Amino acid sequence: MLLRWLARPAERCLGRGGGGGGGGGGDGLLWHAELKPHASGEYSIAVAQANAELEDQGQVVTSPAATFVGVYDGHGGPEASRFISSRLFPHLHRFASEQGGMSTDAIKRAFHATEEEFLHMVKRSWLKQPQIASVGSCCLVGAITDNVLYVANLGDSRAVLGRRGPDGREVVAERLSNDHNVAEEEVRKELTEQHPDDSRIVIYTRGVWRIKGIIQVSRSIGDVYLKKPEFARDPIFRQYVCSIPLKRPVMTAEPSIKEHQLRQQDLFLIFASDGLWEQLTDKAAVDIVFKNPRAGIAKRLVRAALTEAARKREMRYTDIKHIERGSRRNFHDDITVVVVYLDHHKHGVRPNLGNRNSFRFTNAPVDIFSGSSEEVDHHPLRLNLAMDGAVG
């Protein structure tokens, strides 16, 4: 019962629609929340849905001492990204609290705990629902505390820092995450070295590089059949889900983690799923944030990406926004964007992350059907229940 309650946090507040903060200017598949405060500034969040079921999930958790951002880009279905949205932060809070503060080790342990918990769920469910073994999600996390930013990721969602340039009038884009995607030559080389006896570990098919001809990302939460060969070898799974046999794991859940000391010239952060970065360069995105008002800035980035997606098809954004979910995936991917402004940097004693009552949760909707619902801002009591479920 508790897991079902946790699995759909946004749905409890939104129903199954989205659209807080006034919707997307006539786009029923674009949702955003109004500008909100965090420990060292303000943040903005927006989501555009393309798939029949929204496979992206985004969340921001704030307290007086810390800010946490999560962007989870699912594939094969929404189950993994929704699972991460309900489980990762409770694990991270627990491990960081046990260690007396945020650290790369606490983040790594939280990722591993989430992966193991998802694996257990798959083992319980997969005989009745074999496709659950093929569901996965990229996972991008940012945590700010005591003037230090931690960025951790699996997959190809991306965190980009906008910092003031030397002349003070321009902004420089600095990427803070690694793309675990076989489109990157370095990732292909890594896989080839790990699988020297498999000449087909990475295949160019359908216009892109894919691991075993199946998937583009090399690290994720989930995708159990590509990490646990016994699932891929099962006759039922091979008949109904994937017929390619595997001898050993071809993906991992080992996050790349970067620790960055915030500086006065660091102005803002953009966390986004690859749906944004498929359309906009890092520099184009930071220029949009730097040159425009804060109100609705995440929505502005999403609309810029949708405009570019339309341009590539010799269309206008006004044409795309009338296309229904599902069909819209032919033009762009689901897009989740969180912009975090860095207005003041707090120095001093390493702070306690805060007790459970001090956190405020903002989750993007589970699905977006309209532009009229209220934005999601979870009461601390709900977070208490989530924490209790994680620790128990």
UniProtKB/Swiss-Prot annotation:
Pfam families the record matches: PP2C
GO MF annotations in UniProt: metal ion binding; protein serine/threonine phosphatase activity
InterPro entries per record: PP2C, PP2C_BS, PPM-type-like_dom_sf, PPM-type_phosphatase-like_dom
Domain PPM-type phosphatase: 39-342
Cofactor: Mg(2+); Mn(2+)
Protein name: Probable protein phosphatase 2C 78
GO biological process, one term: regulation of intracellular signal transduction
Reaction it catalyzes: O-phospho-L-seryl-[protein] + H2O = L-seryl-[protein] + phosphate; O-phospho-L-threonyl-[protein] + H2O = L-threonyl-[protein] + phosphate
Keyword tags: Hydrolase, Magnesium, Manganese, Metal-binding, Protein phosphatase
Coiled-coil stretches: none
Residues that coordinate or bind Mn(2+) 1: D73, G74
Cited SUPFAM superfamilies: PP2C-like
Taxonomic superkingdom: Eukaryota
Enzyme Commission number(s) from the entry: 3.1.3.16
Cofactor stoichiometry and binding remark: Binds 2 magnesium or manganese ions per subunit.
Family assignment from sequence similarity: Belongs to the PP2C family.
EC class of the enzyme, as a word: hydrolase
Residues annotated for Mn(2+) 2 binding in this entry: D73, D274, D333
